[in-house]
């Protein structure tokens, strides 16, 4: 048996680990299969796989005649039975190095390959090496550690996934509850608002019926008085037509006394301004809360009596590019002109009635419809829809506003202008160091100072009048909320030496006169 194993070792190629096929011998004396050595040299330098001795350049492989004869004399071995690979050191060490034909006993950590003892001497002498079974245990420990970390990550991910599911359930439940609460709250507010609307309309209807009842009573009284006068007149005419003197005197004594004069009529108790005041007191806070643009910076103060304000000054400079808000306002731009019949005698109109200048000397006698104060009104007026216009002022000490047609032309009290001093006008008064919003004789002091380019947005649909400062950026200054019941005219006041210009846009148009424009008052 030992002899047979020895013979097999002698006739075995160290490259393919099988019996020699067409054995050849190298100059160093080692033998290999002819095809095996040729294949080995295609992938590496020409040297002996056993001893690494270089193969001389130009030399030829010599056929090993004795080995060929010996192979022919040996019996053919049966094919080895198929075995199941085992992960033990003996099986691992049965593999051989392709370069040296020796068993693979080491692991080169530098190259990441299994090597033989010859490789450790010739090729991996300076590399980090370890025995296969030792390296195997190290790598298995590393894999087990990785598996442990992975399992921990899996457990953590599953826990986090469960938490996310719980958070999702809580969010859905909370959102559903919140939506239900908000829906109920808004429903109650809508019901309260509808109830208040019905109550307000009912009050207006009651006041209307009372006023109409008074009118009907006065009408009936006048009708009865006219009938009595007519009857007396007819009796007198019949008496005058009587030819018989005795009958004349007899009927004259029976003629009743003439009906006494009724005197002045009783005016019906109907005050439109009072009704509007009551409605505005109710709706203005709601409109300010619900209709105001929350995304825009708010400059106006809430109340005039809030105590001393911070130091006032011009707005911080920023780029003057046209912002989306101003472009949106331009969709309702209106080109306005001043009405010369309303201009104070110290105000001079020019540039096709688009510019007004306050001179120190009168420009002529006062007209019948002109303001006694330094004011001028526009020709155009608006009753429905949304409208926007822009004004450039030479300096502060001006007032911008809108008014009903019946704004008084005379001076009222000690004020320099009457814009916003009564219930029929609304105004923004811009002084050198302050700014106030005026309506019905009440003012709100506002923070900051605007630039010289101003905008006015009149939304009659929603009942909003908003003033804007356009330089150095577009921002709202103040918004009035009211129920406008009559046509509104733009109106202005300016101090001596000031100039005010109505800016025109070439593409701007005015609405149709029957729907949205009223004629100027005489």
Curated annotation (Swiss-Prot):
Q: Where is the B30.2/SPRY domain?
A: 316-509
| Effect of a null allele | TRIM65-deficient mice show impaired NLRP3 ubiquitination and enhanced NLRP3 inflammasome activation.
User: In the record, which positions carry N-acetylalanine?
Assistant: 2
Q: Which GO terms describe its cellular component?
A: cytoplasm; cytosol; nucleoplasm
Reactions that this protein is recorded to catalyse:
S-ubiquitinyl-[E2 ubiquitin-conjugating enzyme]-L-cysteine + [acceptor protein]-L-lysine = [E2 ubiquitin-conjugating enzyme]-L-cysteine + N(6)-ubiquitinyl-[acceptor protein]-L-lysine
Name positions with the PTM Phosphoserine.
187
Coiled-coil annotation reads 141-229
Q: Where in the cell is it found?
A: Cytoplasm
Sorted alphabetically, the Gene Ontology BP terms of this entry are: antiviral innate immune response; negative regulation of inflammatory response; negative regulation of NLRP3 inflammasome complex assembly; positive regulation of autophagy; positive regulation of interferon-alpha production; positive regulation of interferon-beta production; positive regulation of protein oligomerization; protein K48-linked ubiquitination
Give the RING-type zinc finger regions.
13-52
Its UniProt pathway annotation is:
Protein modification; protein ubiquitination
Enzyme Commission number(s): 2.3.2.27
Q: Which GO terms describe its molecular function?
A: protein domain specific binding; ubiquitin protein ligase activity; ubiquitin-protein transferase activity; zinc ion binding
What residue intervals correspond to the zinc fingers (B box-type)?
92-134
Pfam (any one): SPRY
Question: Which residues pair up as cystines?
Answer: none
Chief place of localization: cytoplasm
Keyword set for this entry? Acetylation, Coiled coil, Cytoplasm, Immunity, Innate immunity, Metal-binding, Phosphoprotein, Transferase, Zinc, Zinc-finger
Q: What does this protein do?
A: E3 ubiquitin ligase that plays a role in several processes including innate immnity, autophagy or inflammation. Negatively regulates miRNAs by modulating the ubiquitination and stability of TNRC6A, a protein involved in RNA-mediated gene silencing by both micro-RNAs (miRNAs) and short interfering RNAs. This ubiquitination results in the suppressed expression of miR-138-5p leading to increased autophagy. Upon enteroviral infection, promotes 'Lys-63'-mediated ubiquitination activation of IFIH1/MDA5 leading to innate signaling cascade.
Please give the PANTHER family that the UniProt record associates with this protein: B-BOX DOMAIN CONTAINING, E3 UBIQUITIN-PROTEIN LIGASE TRIM65
What is the annotated quaternary arrangement, including any partners? Homo-multimerizes. Interacts with ARRDC4.
Annotated family: Belongs to the TRIM/RBCC family.
What's this protein's name? E3 ubiquitin-protein ligase TRIM65
| Annotated organism of origin | Mus musculus
